[in-house]
UniProtKB/Swiss-Prot annotation:
<feature type="transmembrane region" description="Helical">
    <location>
        <begin position="112"/>
        <end position="132"/>
    </location>
</feature>
<keyword id="KW-1133">Transmembrane helix</keyword>
<comment type="function">
    <text>Key component of the proton channel; it plays a direct role in the translocation of protons across the membrane.</text>
</comment>
<dbReference type="GO" id="GO:0005886">
    <property type="term" value="C:plasma membrane"/>
</dbReference>
<keyword id="KW-0066">ATP synthesis</keyword>
<feature type="transmembrane region" description="Helical">
    <location>
        <begin position="74"/>
        <end position="94"/>
    </location>
</feature>
<dbReference type="Pfam" id="PF00119">
    <property type="entry name" value="ATP-synt_A"/>
</dbReference>
<keyword id="KW-0813">Transport</keyword>
<dbReference type="GO" id="GO:0046933">
    <property type="term" value="F:proton-transporting ATP synthase activity, rotational mechanism"/>
</dbReference>
<feature type="transmembrane region" description="Helical">
    <location>
        <begin position="148"/>
        <end position="168"/>
    </location>
</feature>
<keyword id="KW-0138">CF(0)</keyword>
<dbReference type="GO" id="GO:0045259">
    <property type="term" value="C:proton-transporting ATP synthase complex"/>
</dbReference>
<keyword id="KW-0472">Membrane</keyword>
<feature type="transmembrane region" description="Helical">
    <location>
        <begin position="17"/>
        <end position="37"/>
    </location>
</feature>
<dbReference type="InterPro" id="IPR023011">
    <property type="entry name" value="ATP_synth_F0_asu_AS"/>
</dbReference>
<dbReference type="InterPro" id="IPR045082">
    <property type="entry name" value="ATP_syn_F0_a_bact/chloroplast"/>
</dbReference>
<dbReference type="GO" id="GO:0042777">
    <property type="term" value="P:proton motive force-driven plasma membrane ATP synthesis"/>
</dbReference>
Length: 244
């Protein structure tokens, strides 16, 4: 592939400009979808309103599968935001990628582990925050010593494992999809430098696999957005529910 990403330093921190660009674009797209689909609400909903209501109902069902809605209602906005943001982020690099002077600018932001691990750390931080808010510091801390204190090290390891798997699962699936799409695109174009006939053959041979893989990547990106949102709600339910 041979692509790198342009970086800059600010206040001693190094920022990947491609990541900054793509997460900004993803955020703007999600904001536009939310505004355009809820701009005019009515008893007889438009197609746009129906679409947003379907997303809200879908997330409500995800929450309801892990906790009762009385407990889970405050997390509905979080779930909808996560689902939409991760889905849009997964899709951005699917149709094409853009590189300038060997610097990759247009890609799926979730194809970078820094983005997915940041999302995972933020989510796990929220689970602890909501747990403390629901139970208080003393009662929440006691949960780590139940049913027996010997399990405390395992529970701490579990927290780190949950964070790693949440972030790396999303990254691995999206990154692998973009790598294979890049290889197929290379198959379609690289042979033109040797021979036009070989280039045409390579293009024809790559068209069907690219269409199939893009369709599969669309499915995987959708599933990964669902899994990330679902696991977020499961982890929150473990922290705020009395039975846990």
């Amino acid at each position: 592939m041979g692509h790198s990403s342009k970086t800059t330093e600010f206040l001693g921190l190094t920022f990947n400009l491609s990541n900054v660009l793509m997460i900004t674009i993803a955020s703007i797209i999600v904001l536009l979808i939310a505004v355009l689909t809820t701009r005019v609400l009515s008893i007889r909903p438009t197609k746009a309103q129906n679409f947003m209501e379907w997303i809200v109902d879908f997330v409500r069902n995800i929450i309801g599968s892990s906790m009762d809605m009385k407990t889970g209602a405050p997390f509905l906005a979080l779930g909808v935001t996560l689902l939409m943001y991760i889905f849009v982020s997964n899709m951005l690099g699917l149709p094409f990628s853009i590189s300038v002077d060997h610097n990759l600018w247009w890609k799926s932001p979730t194809a970078d582990p820094a983005i997915t691990m940041t999302l995972a750390v933020m989510v796990m931080g929220l689970t602890h925050y909501y747990g403390v808010k629901a139970k208080g510091v003393k009662e929440y801390t006691k949960d780590y010593f139940r049913p027996i204190p010997l399990l405390v090290p395992l529970k701490i390891i579990e927290e780190f494992a949950n964070t790693l798997t949440l972030g790396l699962r999303l990254y691995g699936n999206i990154f692998a999809g973009e790598i294979l799409l890049g290889l197929l695109a290379g198959l379609a174009t690289n042979f033109y430098s040797q021979n036009i006939a070989l280039g045409i053959i390579g293009t024809l041979g790559a068209i069907v696999p690219m269409i199939v893989w893009q369709a599969f990547s669309l499915f995987v990106g959708t599933i990964q957005a669902f899994i990330f949102t679902m696991l977020t709600m499961v982890y929150i339910s473990h922290k705020v529910s009395d039975e846990h």
